[in-house]
Regions:
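Active-site beta-strand termini and strand-to-loop segments that position acidic
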Residues: 42-46, 109-112, 122
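Conserved beta-strand in the GNAT
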Residues: 50-54, 108, 117-120
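Short, charged/polar, Gly/Pro-enriched secondary-structure boundary elements
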Residues: 47-51, 61, 114-116
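Acetyl-CoA-dependent GNAT
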Residues: 34, 54-58, 100, 122-123
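Short glycine-enriched loop/turn motifs at secondary-structure junctions
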Residues: 3-6, 62-66, 100-101
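Core segments of cupin and vicinal oxygen chelate
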Residues: 11-49, 54
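Vicinal oxygen chelate
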Residues: 16-17, 70-116
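N-terminal beta-strand motif that seeds the catalytic metal site of vicinal oxygen chelate
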Residues: 1-21, 69-71, 123
Length: 123
């Protein structure tokens, strides 16, 4: 029997791979690990990857996608600091301003393709 690993790849579909790669490089503040004309990978840590993909040679744009990209920081203070930093960056679209939820401080960002990115403190 094959041992199933923990999920280690988060992949989202994008409409403009180059624009999205630049966007996430700015957002994450580090360079991609792998770059191709249709697929870009950012190494999150030694195990997990975050990837963006155009959907292949003939991407299917009609498929709905329901998900949220999560960035967990250590403390509410870090969430507040990152919110201020990103709020000042004209290239980052704050979708929902900083607020307190059951898990602590959080805010939402939308990427160029409308994917929602939630920043919050670790549960």
């Amino acid at each position: 029997m094959i041992k199933i690993r923990k999920p280690n790849l988060q992949l989202i579909y994008v409409s403009d791979i180059q624009h999205s790669a630049e966007y996430y490089q700015n957002l994450f503040n580090f360079e991609p690990y792998f770059v191709s004309p249709r697929y870009v990978v950012f190494k999150v840590d030694g195990v997990a990857d975050f990837a963006i993909w155009s959907g292949g040679e003939s991407p299917e744009h009609e498929s709905p996608r329901f998900a949220e990209i999560g960035i967990n920081l250590e403390t509410d203070t870090e969430v507040k600091e990152l919110y201020k930093e990103w709020k000042a960056d004209a290239g980052i679209n704050i979708y929902k301003d900083l607020y307190t939820d059951v898990f602590g401080e959080t805010f939402l960002v939308k990427d160029p393709d409308g994917h929602v990115i939630r920043v919050s403190s670790a549960d």
